[in-house]
């Protein structure tokens, strides 16, 4: 899994959730936001990698949300990109 792909997926998840931890987002919405076809297998793999890093979590309903660490990382990435 490339770091670039992880960054794109984290950014999409954060933007769709309003950068708020715990706001559930569907995989299909993330796929659309990153320009992938529906049910692209890379997205669940990317989300699982983000989960392993403590940046995203899978809800019981199959939707994903940012963790507080994920929201903080996204803000840091945005601050860095804005320099």
Q: Where is each model-derived feature located?
A:
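Short alpha-helical segments that sit at the start of domains
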Residues: 1-21
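Short acidic, hydrophobic short linear motifs in intrinsically disordered regions
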Residues: 20-34
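Short amphipathic alpha-helical interaction segments
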Residues: 36-52
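A short, conserved structural fragment
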Residues: 51-61
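Minor-groove-contacting beta-hairpin "wing" of winged helix-turn-helix DNA-binding domains
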Residues: 62-68
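Short, amphipathic alpha-helical interaction segments positioned at domain boundaries
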Residues: 69-83
């Amino acid at each position: 899994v490339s770091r670039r792909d992880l960054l794109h997926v984290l950014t999409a998840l954060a933007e769709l959730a309003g950068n708020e931890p715990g706001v559930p987002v569907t995989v299909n919405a993330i796929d659309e936001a990153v320009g992938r076809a529906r049910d692209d297998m890379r997205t669940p793999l990317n989300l699982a990698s983000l989960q392993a890093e403590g940046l995203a979590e899978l809800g019981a309903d199959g939707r994903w949300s940012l963790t507080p660490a994920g929201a903080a990382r996204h803000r840091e990435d945005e601050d860095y990109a804005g320099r």
